[in-house]
Amino acid sequence: MAPPLLLLLLASGAAACPLPCVCQNLSESLSTLCAHRGLLFVPPNVDRRTVELRLADNFIQALGPPDFRNMTGLVDLTLSRNAITRIGARAFGDLESLRSLHLDGNRLVELGTGSLRGPVNLQHLILSGNQLGRIAPGAFDDFLESLEDLDLSYNNLRQVPWAGIGAMPALHTLNLDHNLIDALPPGAFAQLGQLSRLDLTSNRLATLAPDPLFSRGRDAEASPAPLVLSFSGNPLHCNCELLWLRRLARPDDLETCASPPGLAGRYFWAVPEGEFSCEPPLIARHTQRLWVLEGQRATLRCRALGDPAPTMHWVGPDDRLVGNSSRARAFPNGTLEIGVTGAGDAGGYTCIATNPAGEATARVELRVLALPHGGNSSAEGGRPGPSDIAASARTAAEGEGTLESEPAVQVTEVTATSGLVSWGPGRPADPVWMFQIQYNSSEDETLIYRIVPASSHHFLLKHLVPGADYDLCLLALSPAAGPSDLTATRLLGCAHFSTLPASPLCHALQAHVLGGTLTVAVGGVLVAALLVFTVALLVRGRGAGNGRLPLKLSHVQSQTNGGPSPTPKAHPPRSPPPRPQRSCSLDLGDAGCYGYARRLGGAWARRSHSVHGGLLGAGCRGVGGSAERLEESVV
């Protein structure tokens, strides 16, 4: 039975090696070599007892759980320089013995939380040369305790899972070079006691936060685990924030300063420590005082200068820090936005700008004006609805005499969509901050507010509804009697007016004027072009047919033996045939409906004159004066 069993084992071993691969069985470990074989996927018949699997330089595009199922003894997996764009969740779930994973030179864009789950004993992870833009925070959680080498170089990373990297106590080498990292969190490497090489070359780091890790590279002999640190190729901003790094005195590095302008291009370690300075914040401009109506949006602005750029904060009237909430939002540029203001938002706000060199403050006053509704806003009672504005005015006039003997409010020059509101100056002794116009229409019961400066005594209402009835009231907003009182309002007068109905012709023109005018313009251009082409052909054909110019004979006499011939009678020059009469249309300038058509027609007529002036001639003469416009078309 022994010889047949041996043959069976040999046959099974030979069948386990994929056809394009080479299998080597060295000292009880099986190696499957499938590099440079043009594979489009992981061979399904790889021996599950394989210890080393090399699949580099192929065309594999995706990895999934079936590819490495039951390969519990696999130690080294090489997938370099393929076309891998996706790694399925738990694709390496059965590789509990894996020590080295090479995924460099692929096309990975992101790593999810489950992409690298499974290899709990992984020590070397190479992900360089991909297109990684995002790595999930928990992508490295399964091998935090065992990982020794992590290579994330030559990717598009702006952020890396710093919390996971900082929890790798056995990490020796960390390569983050040639990425887009612009900031390092403070203390990111504080727990990496075994780290011996950190490469941050060619990123976007302008500053580095102090970290005890960097001081280990200053004295290689005294440090138990000396650090090789590289951060050249970064746009370092050489100010007081990097003074701690300058004091490390690392003469073997070749870093240079990118800013400020006075230090740009200078060797980092040659700049004296005294030139690593900062500038305290300075409030350049800010909102000094802002008045808003209750319910409106309030935007407080504050801009500060300094080196480094100051951090902006706001303190509210209650001496509390204003943070982001459902009602307010503080932006990093110093803008504070309150979405819907209320009476409790009024008061003094303080803008604070801070940086390592100091701080600066500025005060902004916010006043919230309560919405007036026909009387003094300090009076208690329910707010009138939007449809009873005129009733509120009449009640105030009859009951308390709020409507004083001041010039009445008038609405004149009423059209279908506009009306001019005017009122008198009132009594000089009454201080007025501003005027408020309230109006609504029979088509829409919504009450509309308009704020007018105190220096104005007329206001043009626009965008009214044609053929609608309007009720309008004018109120004067005056300063309150005391600091705790609300704004006082005084009703000046009310008016009722109706807008003109919309003209049917205007609606028709609004619907069709653009298309009709463009059609006429395009047709005119085509007709003019055809006329030019026809005249050119006629002139060329006539010149080619005659060959030479005819001779003109005028008063010619021949000398013969006979008597002189009678002098030919001079014939008057033949008048040219009459030109065909052009059709002219005269626009007298109706501003209501024909304004847009007249402008388009005039523009087309001027273009026709400039391009085909030889055909159109002098055109038609209008009779309406200089203010009238003429549209001309060639028929």
UniProtKB/Swiss-Prot annotation:
Ranges in the topological domain labelled Cytoplasmic: 540-635
Positions of LRR repeats: 49-70, 73-94, 97-118, 121-142, 146-161, 170-191, 194-215
Localization of this protein: Membrane
GO cellular component terms listed in the entry, alphabetical order: cell surface; GABA-ergic synapse; glutamatergic synapse; plasma membrane; postsynaptic density membrane
Biased composition (Pro residues): 565-580
Signal sequence, renumbered to the chain: 1-16
Single Gene Ontology BP annotation: regulation of presynapse assembly
Residues found modified as Phosphoserine: S585, S626
SUPFAM superfamilies per record: Fibronectin type III (SSF49265), Immunoglobulin (SSF48726), L domain-like (SSF52058)
Domain LRRNT: 17-48
Record note on modification: Glycosylated.
Keywords for the protein's UniProt record, in alphabetical order: Disulfide bond, Glycoprotein, Immunoglobulin domain, Leucine-rich repeat, Membrane, Phosphoprotein, Repeat, Signal, Transmembrane, Transmembrane helix
Protein name: Leucine-rich repeat and fibronectin type-III domain-containing protein 4
